[in-house]
Amino acid sequence: MIIPVRCFSCGRVIASDYVRFTEACTKIINETGREPRGEEKAKILDDLGVKRYCCRRMILSHKDLIDEVLPY
């Protein structure tokens, strides 16, 4: 629903990285008109300094559902 502030496994702060990750993905969508590919997402995460696979999992697997749940 809401991106966790810290990684569940290692405790690293990831909320700020998630915001920058979504901004970079939106930029790719606006420039190319398509979703970013896996290699592009990997490069974005590398550029953000997200090296651990547990933190990468937290960012890549998050689905923002707050707007759908908020009316209830």
UniProtKB/Swiss-Prot annotation:
* Reaction it catalyzes: RNA(n) + a ribonucleoside 5'-triphosphate = RNA(n+1) + diphosphate
Keywords assigned: Cytoplasm, DNA-directed RNA polymerase, Metal-binding, Nucleotidyltransferase, Transcription, Transferase, Zinc
Q: What is its EC number?
A: 2.7.7.6
Annotated GO molecular function terms are: DNA binding; DNA-directed RNA polymerase activity; zinc ion binding
User: Where is it chiefly localized?
Assistant: cytoplasm
Subcellular localization, as worded in the UniProt entry = Cytoplasm
Q: Which InterPro entries does the record associate with it?
A: RNA_pol_su_RPB10 (IPR023580), RNA_pol_suN_Zn-BS (IPR020789), RPABC5/Rpb10 (IPR000268)
Gene3D superfamilies, sorted = Homeodomain-like
Q: Which residues bind Zn(2+)?
A: C7, C10, C54, C55
Q: Which HAMAP family match?
A: RNApol_arch_Rpo10 (MF_00250)
Q: Which NCBIfam families match?
A: PRK04016.1
Kindly state the subunit structure of this protein: Part of the RNA polymerase complex.
Question: Which family is this protein grouped under?
Answer: Belongs to the archaeal Rpo10/eukaryotic RPB10 RNA polymerase subunit family.
Name of the protein described by the UniProt record? DNA-directed RNA polymerase subunit Rpo10
